[in-house]
């Protein structure tokens, strides 16, 4: 090797190696400080792209798991409301069984109906006011709930939010109770009439005979009765016998007293009765609630299974991403130690290399 002054080759080689060791030391320190093997695309371009996709999936699946938990929450909220409606229906059924007992007076049944009406109003209130995050779950406002449980389009779970109220359950008050209006009937007055009249073409007596069906006097039913109107007064015969021939007509009221009466139309009596199929109607409504609750229970189990699967997937993807992205501290500490040693050695050697041109000066002495 020529002895020169302007170019110190050994110093240049030493500086180059010192730069390399410094880069190695800097990279090791960066990885140790960040905990990542890939801090920029230059560290591993392909690995960085793969890790980024894994990050996207992990973040999406984590959110999907939270979505599924929200689905469980809304199903639990809905089921809780249905449970309360079921309790109300059970109370109505109990009251209906009580109302069907023959020992109840009309006022007793009216009192029972009043309580039933209040319970039915509560069912409608629950239907209208039960909500989750502003969504009314039983009013029919939103018939279908869609929960995103994946990281891609159409990865959803759907379940129905059925409208539940008195009308849809078929338990409105008029479906359980029946109001009947009973006529008080007639008010009897006057005495019996026993005479008979002859009727012919020249008669000036006006009579009207009218058949009455189901006349009830003093609580005793009679049949085949006639009203005879004469001079503005009405007479009733329980039996009658008429003869018609070519020359004239005889009207006979045989073996029966007649009675003057008037109709009292202003005093109708209303009776309240439980419908014959009221209990069957309530059983059908309770079965409807049971079916809805079973569906919500099934969807909750499905969401729990989905959450478990999502969490497992997140764990596996996170582990895969870690193997690509995260720094191995054992390796990086070793690299840092090696870099530090090379830096110290390089600095010392560079000092020695810089002294080489000094040997040329000895030739000038």
Curated annotation (Swiss-Prot):
One of its GO terms (cellular component) is extracellular region. It holds the Pfam family Flagellin_C. Flagellin is the subunit protein which polymerizes to form the filaments of bacterial flagella. Induction: Although swimmer cells have only a few flagella, the elongated swarmer cells are profusely covered by thousands of new flagella synthesized specifically in response to growth on surfaces or in highly viscous liquids. Its main location: secreted. Keywords: Bacterial flagellum, Secreted. It is found in: Secreted; Bacterial flagellum. This is Flagellin 1. One of its GO terms (molecular function) is structural molecule activity. Belongs to the bacterial flagellin family. Gene3D superfamilies: 2.60.40.4390, 6.10.280.190, f41 fragment of flagellin, N-terminal domain, Flagellar export chaperone, C-terminal domain. Transmembrane segments: none annotated. InterPro entries: Flagellin, Flagellin_C, Flagellin_C_sub2, Flagellin_N. It comes from Proteus mirabilis.
